[in-house]
C-alpha cells in the first residue's frame, strides 16, 4: 500500500545553501521532518546550480519520511540573471530598467518548459515575455 501524504511544504531555497536556520528549519520542524537529512540531500542535489534560487516541493508522509522534487528557478530570477540587474522596476509601466533579447527569452522558456503549463515553446516564450514586461524589462528582437 502506498504511503499517505500528510503535508506538502513548498519552499524557495538558494541552491546548495540550505541550512537548518530560518526559514528552512522552522518550516520543516513543524512538519516533523529530519532537518539535517533534508538539508544534506538538497545541497547535494543542487550543488551544480549555485547562485540560483530553487523552488522545492517536499511531500511529508504519515511516518514522517519525506521525498522532495526540485523545480526550475523562477522566471524572474532567470530574467534578472540574463539582463544583469539586481531587481526589476518598481514602476514597470513607467520606468524600464533593462532589455532582454528574444533569443534570451527563448533560452529561458526552454529551461522553464518542464514546469510551465504551455503546449509549445512559443506559448512558453509569451509567458516569459509577460513576466519580463511586468518587471520593467523591454523585449527586443
UniProtKB/Swiss-Prot annotation:
Q: Does the record's keyword annotation contain rRNA-binding? A: yes
An example of a Gene Ontology cellular component annotation for this protein is: cytosolic large ribosomal subunit
Q: What Gene Ontology molecular-function terms does this entry list?
A: large ribosomal subunit rRNA binding; structural constituent of ribosome
Q: Which CDD domains does the entry mention?
A: Ribosomal_L11
The record's keywords, sorted A to Z, are: Methylation, Ribonucleoprotein, Ribosomal protein, RNA-binding, rRNA-binding
Q: Which PROSITE patterns match?
A: RIBOSOMAL_L11 (PS00359)
Pfam families in the cross-refs = Ribosomal_L11, Ribosomal_L11_N
- PTM summary: One or more lysine residues are methylated.
* A GO BP entry: translation
**Quick one: signal sequence residues?**
none
Output the InterPro entries linked to this UniProt entry.
Ribosomal_uL11 (IPR000911), Ribosomal_uL11_bac-typ (IPR006519), Ribosomal_uL11_C (IPR020783), Ribosomal_uL11_C_sf (IPR036769), Ribosomal_uL11_CS (IPR020785), Ribosomal_uL11_N (IPR020784), Ribosomal_uL11_N_sf (IPR036796)
Q: Which family is this sequence assigned to? A: Belongs to the universal ribosomal protein uL11 family.
Assembly behavior:
Part of the ribosomal stalk of the 50S ribosomal subunit. Interacts with L10 and the large rRNA to form the base of the stalk. L10 forms an elongated spine to which L12 dimers bind in a sequential fashion forming a multimeric L10(L12)X complex.
The entry's function note states: Forms part of the ribosomal stalk which helps the ribosome interact with GTP-bound translation factors.
Q: What is this protein called?
A: Large ribosomal subunit protein uL11
Q: Which organism is this entry from?
A: Streptococcus gordonii (strain Challis / ATCC 35105 / BCRC 15272 / CH1 / DL1 / V288)
